[in-house]
């Protein structure tokens, strides 16, 4: 199976998981009302971005911590989310994920699920978040504040010996979804595939 087919397959599986969780939470919520889109929501572009502003030197063994930031979170309940980030597995080693700063309804920072070994084999970090509490641990607008509470999670890498000075290492968000309770009916899901959320990728330069 080609790398592209694997990515497509994983994306389909994650989408089905997200859809199933959203359906389950939707069925159990006491106040399952349509998302009320505000004028601010309509005027704002939602961008999921990778960023890193430190110098990376050849041979360095320091952790490379890359924040995954959201530019804006619209009104609504977001009980599940997923993202796939491609990286150069020959020159970068994926170490894991550290918590971000975005909070859920309970004012805690959600923990995402990921597989280090599978990521390093495929060159794709697949991370997923599912709220199993019935919405109290879902992402809400109140848990987002640009510049303070806008980091969804942090991806952690290390350089491999194969990475040399002058190398340009691409990290690309190939797919990402923040699913709402009623996303299938009111089109409120944030999705890079549906262009309701944009992505900003990253190039790391080895000095």
Predicted features by range, described:
Residues 2-207:
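Acidic, low-complexity intrinsically disordered segments
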């Amino acid at each position: 199976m080609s790398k592209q087919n694997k990515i497509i397959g994983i994306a389909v599986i994650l989408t089905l998981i997200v859809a199933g969780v959203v359906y389950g939470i939707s069925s159990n919520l006491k106040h399952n009302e349509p998302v009320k889109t505000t004028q601010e929501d309509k005027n704002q572009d939602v961008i999921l971005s990778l960023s890193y502003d430190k110098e990376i030197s050849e041979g360095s063994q320091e952790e490379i911590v890359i924040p995954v930031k959201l530019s804006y979170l619209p009104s609504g309940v977001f009980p599940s989310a997923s993202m796939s980030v491609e990286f150069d597995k020959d020159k970068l080693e994926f170490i894991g994920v550290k918590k971000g700063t975005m909070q859920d309804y309970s004012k805690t920072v959600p923990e995402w699920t990921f597989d280090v070994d599978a990521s390093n084999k495929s060159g794709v970090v697949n991370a997923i978040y599912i709220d199993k509490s019935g919405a109290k641990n879902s992402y809400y607008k109140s848990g987002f504040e640009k510049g303070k509470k806008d980091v969804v999670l942090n991806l952690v890498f290390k350089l491999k010996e194969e990475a040399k000075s002058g190398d340009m290492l691409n990290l690309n968000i190939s797919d990402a979804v923040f699913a709402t309770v009623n996303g299938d009916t009111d089109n409120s899901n944030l999705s890079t595939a549906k262009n309701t959320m944009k992505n900003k990728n990253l190039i790391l330069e080895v000095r």
